[in-house]
């Protein structure tokens, strides 16, 4: 194992991974929900969902509008797709599923439809009552910029902004970043995506910069891959009896996996690399970095 694969955080992330034991049953390795998709954006929820599965979750449910459902189903038969997000009684139909899910990802491909955003805001409020761990990405973050109270003091929330989304949430003054993060209250973690991803813990005021940088190719969908991978790692971290900073370690694991997938795929495909090429590398990256090895 190379020296770069021996960092303390990577070792902690490796310890989260459940062993593949014959006694385990379907669902124990993670039941993940993806809330997103729209007529224009069907790829994003698919990328997030399939990444969660390929990292190791057992089941992934996608909650999307009717117009996106058939397309997403066509991408993969492994996904469970619910065309409910724009229905008149969306909350009534989706709420019973929430209890069954371990972690939800809110935002990939969601779009800005006013009524759907209202529905998603209500889902976030219900998830808070259920103490459901959330990862909020993409247009889910737009919703938070409109009402930061949705996640203030919500222990178990991870926000995943890129550089532009980060500035919208917290301003451009880097010297005031931690003070601005204080608006979130306690228990919210932020991973800012960039050349080197930065993880901020609003509870402890801890900051960590991930050393892995990937390649110069920035294809669309990488953030969705990270969000899906993060959901699986986060569930494993929350289930761990030893991990004292589950969100921090899960963010590090997802960032490292995503950047390394980028590096591997770029080596194979160069400038023509797409997110699908990165997803094809998940199995190899996971085996190299996270899988339990027999002595």
Curated annotation (Swiss-Prot):
Q: Domain of life, per the record?
A: Eukaryota
The protein's matches in Gene3D superfamilies, at most eight in alphabetical order, are given as:
3.40.1190.20
Q: Which cofactor does it need?
A: Mg(2+)
Please tell me where ATP binds in this chain.
193-197, 214-223
Annotated GO molecular function terms are: ATP binding; ATP-dependent NAD(P)H-hydrate dehydratase activity
Tell me the keywords, alphabetical order. Answer: ATP-binding, Lyase, NAD, NADP, Nucleotide-binding, Phosphoprotein
Annotated CDD domains: YXKO-related (cd01171)
Any Pfam family the entry gives: Carb_kinase
The enzyme's E.C. designation: 4.2.1.93
| Catalytic activity field | (6S)-NADHX + ATP = ADP + phosphate + NADH + H(+); (6S)-NADPHX + ATP = ADP + phosphate + NADPH + H(+)
Q: Which GO terms describe its biological process?
A: metabolite repair; nicotinamide nucleotide metabolic process
Record-annotated YjeF C-terminal domain positions? 9-289
Residue ranges annotated as transmembrane are none
Q: Which sites bind (6S)-NADPHX?
A: 109, 162-168, 224
Question: What family is this?
Answer: Belongs to the NnrD/CARKD family.
What does this protein do, in the record's words?
Catalyzes the dehydration of the S-form of NAD(P)HX at the expense of ATP, which is converted to ADP. Together with NAD(P)HX epimerase, which catalyzes the epimerization of the S- and R-forms, the enzyme allows the repair of both epimers of NAD(P)HX, a damaged form of NAD(P)H that is a result of enzymatic or heat-dependent hydration.
Which HAMAP family does the UniProt record give?
NADHX_dehydratase
PANTHER family on file? ATP-DEPENDENT (S)-NAD(P)H-HYDRATE DEHYDRATASE, ATP-DEPENDENT (S)-NAD(P)H-HYDRATE DEHYDRATASE FAMILY MEMBER
Query: Under which name does UniProt file this protein?
Result: ATP-dependent (S)-NAD(P)H-hydrate dehydratase
In its UniProt entry, the species of origin is given as: Anopheles darlingi (Mosquito)
């Amino acid at each position: 194992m190379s020296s770069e694969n021996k960092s303390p955080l990577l070792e902690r992330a490796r310890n989260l991974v459940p062993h593949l034991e014959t006694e385990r049953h379907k669902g124990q390795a993670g039941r993940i929900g993806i809330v997103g998709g729209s007529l224009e954006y069907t790829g994003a929820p698919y990328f997030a969902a399939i990444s969660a599965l390929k990292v190791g979750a057992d089941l992934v449910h996608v909650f999307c509008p009717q117009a996106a459902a058939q397309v997403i189903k066509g991408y993969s038969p492994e996904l469970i797709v619910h065309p409910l997000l724009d229905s008149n009684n969306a909350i009534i139909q989706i709420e019973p599923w929430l209890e069954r899910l371990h972690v939800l990802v809110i935002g990939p491909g969601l779009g800005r439809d006013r009524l759907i955003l209202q529905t998603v805001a209500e889902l976030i409020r219900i998830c808070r009552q259920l103490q459901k761990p959330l990862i909020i990405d993409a247009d889910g973050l737009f919703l938070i910029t409109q009402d930061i109270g949705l996640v203030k003091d919500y222990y178990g929330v991870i926000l995943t902004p890129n550089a532009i989304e980060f500035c919208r949430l917290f301003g451009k003054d880097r010297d005031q970043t931690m003070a601005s993060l204080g608006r979130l209250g306690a228990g919210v973690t932020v991973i800012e995506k960039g050349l080197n991803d930065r993880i901020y813990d609003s509870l402890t005021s801890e900051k960590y910069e991930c050393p892995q940088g990937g390649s110069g190719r920035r294809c669309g969908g990488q953030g969705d891959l990270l969000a899906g991978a993060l959901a699986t790692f986060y569930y494993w971290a929350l289930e761990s009896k030893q991990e004292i900073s589950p969100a921090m370690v899960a963010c590090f694991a997802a960032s490292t996996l995503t950047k390394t997938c980028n590096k591997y795929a770029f080596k194979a495909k160069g400038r023509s690399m797409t997110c699908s090429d990165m997803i094809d590398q998940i199995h190899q990256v996971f085996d190299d970095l996270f899988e339990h090895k027999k002595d």
